[in-house]
Amino acid sequence: MYYPDVPALDPEDIELLCNEYIAHNKHLDPHIADRLGVKRGLRNPDGTGVLAGITNVSSVIGYEKLPEGTIRPIPGRLVYRGIDIDTLAAEADKNDRFMFEEVVWLLLFGALPTQEQYARFCKLIDEHRELPKGFADDMIMNSPSPNIMNKMARSVLSMYSYDEHADDLSLPNILTQSINLIAELPTMMVNAYQLKRRVYDHESMYFHYPIAGQSTAEHILSSYRADQKFTHEEARLLDLCLLVHADHGGGNCSTFTTRVLSSSGTDTYSAIAAAIGALKGPKHGGANLMVNRQLKDILKHVENPEDDDEVREYLRRILRKQAGDGSGLIYGMGHAVYTISDPREVILKQRAKHLAYEKGFEEEYNMLCSIERLAPGIFAEEKGSSKPVCANVDLFSGLIYNMLGISEDLYTPLFAIARVPGWCAHRVEEVIFANRIIRPAYKYLGVRQKYKPIEER
């Protein structure tokens, strides 16, 4: 293992410190928070998010609030700058072209690019794929990490040292930094992964120079694969994954993190590195990996995947914490906003089928379809709730990455690459228009105590 040669903390010391903490820190009862009107998790009692700001970037729609205050479930919509992602995905299909770069422009600037603007923008991103001179050696090769998200966050922070105007908060500078990060982050990811393979997995590593004229999806596949070969359909499907993950409103954990840091007046690299750190958390960015692992477990234990009764019974056991990883969660099901459907999941499910059947993933694809179809009824029976539960984007995204031969190490990093344009768009909006530091309040519930001189303790 590649760790600094420093002495470990004594287990007895750690136990002593833990006991000290437990002795002086009482449990924070959530019922007290409810009585005080605290919006835990910045959620309203009905599960909807607290209104914390306004934005022009995107809109996440999963329900309608009726005049009496109740919620009416509706089919989900995700709207980038006034355009539904369904429309963007359909346009990509209609003209058989890559759409992510156009979505990046749309999110950053607020309108669709002209043909000339689009061509110049793609060229601009293409010309900035390479990392600054010496960066790969100094910041990546000399300090590997077993976790690619950790390495990406550190790499982004390190970019501060290569930027003469790192703290400049003017619009031209923030846009310059944003475009550079959007272009360079895929290269950082693949380089970090190759080094991880060599140092931690004891496998061969290889580095490819970016190929001119490639889309972001093509660049990722060609730089990731040893032979640099991929099919147009594979690249198009990855491009679609990037498209549907590019933004998701201002209230999700990583985007809100970006806004909180941006409101303080800090630099772009600190804000985006913090967003990567937030996305690294398994409650936010790692669900598609858990879906894949759960899918393998289900296929291992269900003798007949086409038998709905057998599948239903195993899902019931998962909910009861009698099967799976013991969490009681059916990964890929349920969402904080969407009720009837997640438009991102609908898009990926439809577009993934052909490649799944072509590459021999028919059984996996069909099982995910069965989970989507059967799980809502099981939730209703087991939880005794009429609240609608739909499949979310993670249900099929992990399978797509698996079909593309992408390592599980890169599932969440790919999410980060897709989401950087959204983070940057929200950062620009926060810096240029908000102009007020985000500062919510916490109620102190601790004890009052008098100070004792140290010689009396």
Q: PLM features: what roles do these ranges have?
A:
Residues 1-457:
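Non-transmembrane, aqueous-exposed alpha-helical and coiled segments at domain scale
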